[in-house]
Amino acid sequence: MKNKNILILGSTGFIGRSLTKKLLSKGHHITSPVRNPDKVKRNILSGDIGQINIIPFNVSNLYSIEADIKEADIIVNLLGILFEKPNRSFDTIHYHVPKVIADMANKHNKRFIHISSLGSTTETKSSYLYSKALGEQYIETNHNNYSIIKPSIVFGEEDNFLNQFGYMTKFLPFLPLYKKGNTKFQPIYLDDLTSFISEIIDSDDSNFLNKSIDAVGPNIYSFKEILEMIFEIVKKKKRFINIPDFFASLQGRLMGALPNPPFTYDQFLSLSHDSISPGADKFIEASLGRELSSMKLVASNYLKKFIDKV
């Protein structure tokens, strides 16, 4: 396998840290454009000296990395946000950024791997899902060497989803159910997802080229079933409270004003859309040559910390 020069946008995020370490372990060279260089210290420790190149980067000046894109073999875009701030909108991060990066990658004939989101659609009131769909559509229309990966919920030891609700069981007598807990998800384990992205990077298989690929795990759960699983792992009685849509939307608007909101109005809107792709897991299993990981089995290991000590 030929070692490649890979530029990763979003290398300090939950998925980015895992992917960077995996690619470094395979001997690839990584260029990591970051706003705060100190954030990538953990990744540096997993690579050899000179194997990772950290460069300053800000989305307000995307063309500052064009020379680095020209020198790379593959561009991976993992940039994404779950809530907006005055200086970073969904439209900017999910549409404008991938548009400009895709154009530069196309100009220099570089392969572009874009990580989006399962459930993205222009038929939605959710700005998050809408902006994700716009980014995908631009790449599909204007780039000639791309792969778009669309994960459902990604879980792992440092995730902000299962851990958040596990933490809530320690302090709340119940967990909230939005949309009656009926929204469906097909969660994928972080290591499975980054192994799959790594496989795409290493492979010249045409099955990955110029395609949008749903990245999901082996099991489909409703939101309520996920919370029930968390209660089982932390050994607590299952207690829920159904939040009517009116109060859920109000709660989302109020919480959305916080610096790091645990729930927003846009997230409430996104719960009107399932995040599943039945059968798509088989394609990933075939690509990896193994079965995908069970959420309950994996999560049991890292949610134990929320079990009350006797």
Spans of features found by a protein language model:
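N-terminal Rossmann NAD(P)H-binding glycine-rich loop of SDR-like oxidoreductase domains
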Residues: 4-26, 33
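SDR active-site strand-loop-helix element
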Residues: 9, 33, 78-79, 112-118, ...
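NAD(P)H-binding glycine-rich loop region in Rossmannoid oxidoreductase-like domains
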Residues: 38, 46-99, 104-106, 118-122
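Conserved beta-loop-beta element that borders a ligand/cofactor-binding pocket
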Residues: 137-167
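Glycine/proline-rich active-site loop of Rossmann-fold NAD(P)-dependent oxidoreductases
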Residues: 156-164, 200-213, 236-237
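Substrate-positioning beta->alpha
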Residues: 160-161, 179-202, 211
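Substrate-binding strand-loop-helix patch
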Residues: 182-191, 213-232, 242-253, 291-294
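A hydrophobic C-terminal alpha-helical subdomain
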Residues: 246-309
